[in-house]
């Protein structure tokens, strides 16, 4: 299953009883703020959920799998997500529940 912005908006629409346009704008503004912060090189910390931060990767050697030719992979900056403890705990407990159901 994939959770989309449209599904988030629909869920919030039913929970908050605001107009669909206001909810859509709210979701869009939230994600735009996350994007802007990361573009500026800032971390995004969402308490109880996790942190988004940037990691600089150095140039490294790579290989074209079709030709076998060695090519350099250029240095770049990537976005990394590190889940918070609460999120990790919930995911782990869900995994344990699913494992118990599979055993039965």
Curated annotation (Swiss-Prot):
CDD domains: IHF_A (cd13835). InterPro entries: Hist_DNA-bd (IPR000119), Histone-like_DNA-bd_CS (IPR020816), IHF-like_DNA-bd_dom_sf (IPR010992), IHF_alpha (IPR005684). Gene3D superfamilies: IHF-like DNA-binding proteins. SMART domains: BHL. GO terms for molecular function: DNA binding; structural constituent of chromatin. Pfam families: Bac_DNA_binding. GO terms for cellular component: cytosol. Keywords: DNA recombination, DNA-binding, Transcription, Transcription regulation, Translation regulation. One of its GO terms (biological process) is regulation of DNA-templated transcription. Belongs to the bacterial histone-like protein family. Heterodimer of an alpha and a beta chain. This protein is one of the two subunits of integration host factor, a specific DNA-binding protein that functions in genetic recombination as well as in transcriptional and translational control. This is Integration host factor subunit alpha. It comes from Buchnera aphidicola subsp. Cinara cedri (strain Cc).
């Amino acid at each position: 299953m994939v959770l989309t912005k449209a599904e988030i908006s629909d869920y919030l629409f039913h929970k908050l009883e605001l107009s669909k346009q206001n909810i859509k704008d709210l979701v869009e503004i939230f994600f735009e703020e996350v994007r802007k912060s990361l573009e500026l090189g800032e971390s995004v910390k969402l308490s109880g959920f996790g942190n988004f931060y940037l990691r600089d990767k150095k140039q490294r050697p790579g290989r074209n799998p079709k030709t076998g030719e060695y090519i350099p992979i250029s240095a770049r900056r990537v976005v990394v997500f590190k889940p918070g403890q609460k999120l990790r705990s919930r995911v782990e407990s869900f995994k344990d529940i699913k494992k118990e159901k599979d055993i039965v």
